Every structure is written in C-alpha cells, then in structure tokens.
Amino acid sequence: MSELSQLSPQPLWDIFAKICSIPHPSYHEEQLAEYIVGWAKEKGFHVERDQVGNILIRKPATAGMENRKPVVLQAHLDMVPQKNNDTVHDFTKDPIQPYIDGEWVKARGTTLGADNGIGMASALAVLADENVVHGPLEVLLTMTEEAGMDGAFGLQGNWLQADILINTDSEEEGEIYMGCAGGIDFTSNLHLDREAVPAGFETFKLTLKGLKGGHSGGEIHVGLGNANKLLVRFLAGHAEELDLRLIDFNGGTLRNAIPREAFATIAVAADKVDVLKSLVNTYQEILKNELAEKEKNLALLLDSVANDKAALIAKSRDTFIRLLNATPNGVIRNSDVAKGVVETSLNVGVVTMTDNNVEIHCLIRSLIDSGKDYVVSMLDSLGKLAGAKTEAKGAYPGWQPDANSPVMHLVRETYQRLFNKTPNIQIIHAGLECGLFKKPYPEMDMVSIGPTITGPHSPDEQVHIESVGHYWTLLTELLKEIPAK
C-alpha cells in the first residue's frame, strides 16, 4: 500500500499513487493508457479510443440526475520528465517515487507528475466513487499534451456528447481559469565548421547548474535563471579575450521547461588557464549577486577534461555565441487587458550542438496571435542575420475568455458558498488544451480548475495536500449543481 493512502480523499490519492507507479512521460503513455482502459472496462464503463490514442470513458447519470447537462472531465495522460543531475532514473521504465513532506506531496529527485496526474486521478475517482452525484458524465484523457498537444490536435468533432468541459490542468486552488495563451515552437539551425585544437591548449568542461527551472509559461514572469542564456553570457564576454576554443555547448532538455543546467566544453592556452579560472569565479559571484533571492543553489563549475574533438573555427564560434546571446528570453510584454498577466513570452529551452550544427529551440507563448507573430518575426530576423535556417512550427491557439460563461459563474458561486471566499477569475500564461477543443466543439462551455501545484516541469514539483481536498470538494459539489438541459 502506498504512503499516500493515508491522505484524503483516499480514492483520489490511491489512483494517483497507481499513476505514479506506471511510467508515462510524453510519447510513452501507452502503458498507462492500456491500464486505464482495462480499469474502466473492469468497472463496466463504456470506453473508446480515437485514432491518436485519446481515451473517452462514459458513465450514466446517477439516479435523479438524468436531465442535467452532460459534462466531460478532461486531463492529459503524459507528464514532463525532468530529474536532478545526480538522480538515476529512466522515465520510460522506472516508477515515480512520491512521498509526503509536511503539507506537500513530492517526488524523489524527479518531477512528480501532479501535472496532470492529480487531475487525471480526480476524474477517475469521480467515476469510481459511487457516492459522487452527477449527471451524464464523460472522462476525456488526451495524449502527449506536454510535448505538442497531439491528443488535442487530433480530437475529432461529434465524439464528445457533453455540453460542458471541466479541464483539470490548472495549478492554483482558489483560482478559476477561463482563458490561456497560445504558443508556437521556433528553431534556429546554424551550420558549424571545425578545426583542430592547437597544441598546448588545455580543455575544460564549464557547467552551470543548480537553477530551479520550472514551467516556461506559469513561471516565466518570476525571473528565474535560464541556464542557456547565463552560460552563453560568460562566453560572449570572454571568448575573444581568452582566445577560447569552443568544442561543445548543450543546455536544457524541454522547450516548455526553463533550463536548469547548461554545459560548454572549452579549451584555452596553458598560459591563460589561471585567467580563465579567475573569470569563472568572478562570474559566479556576479550571478549569485544578481540572482541572490531567486537562485540560491546556482553553481558555475570548471573541470579539467580529456578531449579528442575539434573546436569551432572562430567565425562559427562567434556567430553561435552572438546568436544565442542576442536571442531574447522571458517576458516580452505584459497584457494591457488582463492585469498582472503576461501577454507574450519566450523561453530559450534547448540548445543542442553536434559536429556541424547547433539547434536553438524556443517556445513562444502569447495571449494574442499578433504577439506570437511579432516574436516569430524577431527571431527569424535574428537568425537570418546569423545565417541560420529558421522554422516556426507546431502552433496552437489560445483559449479566448468568455466573461458570460455559465459554467465559470457556476464554479465561482459554488466555490464562494463552500469556502466563504471569492475565487480569482484568471487567464493563464500557459497552454491549456481548451483552445484546441474549441475548434471541433465551438459551443462547448469550458472552465479549468485544479489544486495548488508548485514547481511543475522541474524536480521541485510538489502538490499541496489540503488544496487537493478543497479541489475534490469543489469538483464533486460542482457536478451536483450542473443545471438541467
């Protein structure tokens, strides 16, 4: 039995513990999907899958609720696979190890997958709990949301029967989400030429580590360090001065996670090693001063390494460094309409260098299409100046807020009655699948709720136990209050 079984509501936590035990990173959700299909069939529910693998489970209304508007509870099957550098974990094979730490549930050295595992568990717990009162009910579990919203893109019209969709992918209890940002991936690929490292040069690995990382939408406004940007800043400041040879540069693992670590392999002449060490120490102190409140565990390490690879020629080195150093990152503009909400942002998520190419992979988010288009244009111009090949792809729409949404008003009234306080109505600067659902289901009334999750998309991810109880109370009470057709 899982340690989580002592928590309330127990059915939800037991299901979440089971979800944690089955590997389900993006593109590897099939084992979990098969388990859920079998679980639902065993309980006698109607189950279907579509051509992209989405799961739809139907349950009839409880007695006396047959005339209520049908509702679909929606979550995504995949989780973001992030781990600490010293954690040995294969996300495709190893279970997540959740544990209780005071008021929170965390995972040992990895992302927890509360995003969106708690939402998924809550939907399945509603199906399983015979004490929950509800009208005609569907549960929709989508594929590969975190890596490209594949399931939402593939969702066909005339499959769902519901009039109301409750998305469970929000991460702040007491807040009701009625809109979200859209996004687009942007890559710049730069050709590299190499030459042998001169004799008498010593090779080092420069590592920037210890950053918090996090969700590139929900936490982009916080001002956390971006490992790719911070490491290239050092190279931009000192490459020519040190006659530095750049052999390798890699940073970040996911375009939708703020990168926590970046690595550069460099070589300098033996008589400049002491200068390099001094500059590294000085730069580390500069960063610790600048990010003293946000990144207390930041570390910049310089380690001597063996090397048999060629280095970039000076032109390739300088072009790459200048391109990455000049690439914007973070908040581009705050919204004039939604106060306190980021309108447009950019995350320089992944930098991958091979022998003759380097790819810079960014994720652009915006509440408005024109904001997204502007950043694409800016990055395209920058890439072309550097001679890089650029591509924008994988665009997904935002979810336009509807101030007159009946379900949003119902959630607000229900929350206020249950907890004697007014919830915040919010637009989130992150991608929810609701925007894509609006295309095949334009008349669907939608809202997004969830418990408090901090540090999503990072090994610091944790979910607040009490908030899960509040979220469950709200969700189950809301299902009782859904109006008649």
From Swiss-Prot:
Keywords from the named record: Acetylation, Cobalt, Dipeptidase, Hydrolase, Metal-binding, Metalloprotease, Protease, Zinc
Its EC number(s): 3.4.13.18
Regulation: Inhibited by metal chelators.
Temperature dependence (free text): Optimum temperature is 37 degrees Celsius.
InterPro entries noted in UniProt: Peptidase_M20 (IPR002933), Peptidase_M20_dimer (IPR011650), Peptidase_M20C (IPR001160)
Gene knockout outcome: A quadruple peptidase disruption (pepA, pepB, pepD and pepN) does not grow in M9 minimal medium, grows better when supplemented with casamino acids.
GO MF, one annotated term: protein homodimerization activity
Residues bound to Zn(2+) 2: H76, D115, D169
Note on how the cofactor is bound: Binds 2 Zn(2+) ions per subunit. Can also use Co(2+).
Active site (record annotation): D78, E145 (proton acceptor)
pH dependence: Optimum pH is 9.
N6-acetyllysine found at: K296
Cofactor field: Zn(2+); Co(2+)
GO cellular component terms given for this protein: cytosol
Example GO BP: proteolysis
The reaction(s) this protein catalyses: Hydrolysis of dipeptides, preferentially hydrophobic dipeptides including prolyl amino acids
Residues involved in Zn(2+) 1 binding: D115, E146, H457
Biological role: Dipeptidase with broad substrate specificity. Requires dipeptide substrates with an unblocked N-terminus and the amino group in the alpha or beta position. Non-protein amino acids and proline are not accepted in the C-terminal position, whereas some dipeptide amides and formyl amino acids are hydrolyzed. Also shows cysteinylglycinase activity, which is sufficient for E.coli to utilize cysteinylglycine as a cysteine source.
Stated family: Belongs to the peptidase M20C family.
Protein name per its UniProtKB record: Cytosol non-specific dipeptidase
Originating gene: pepD
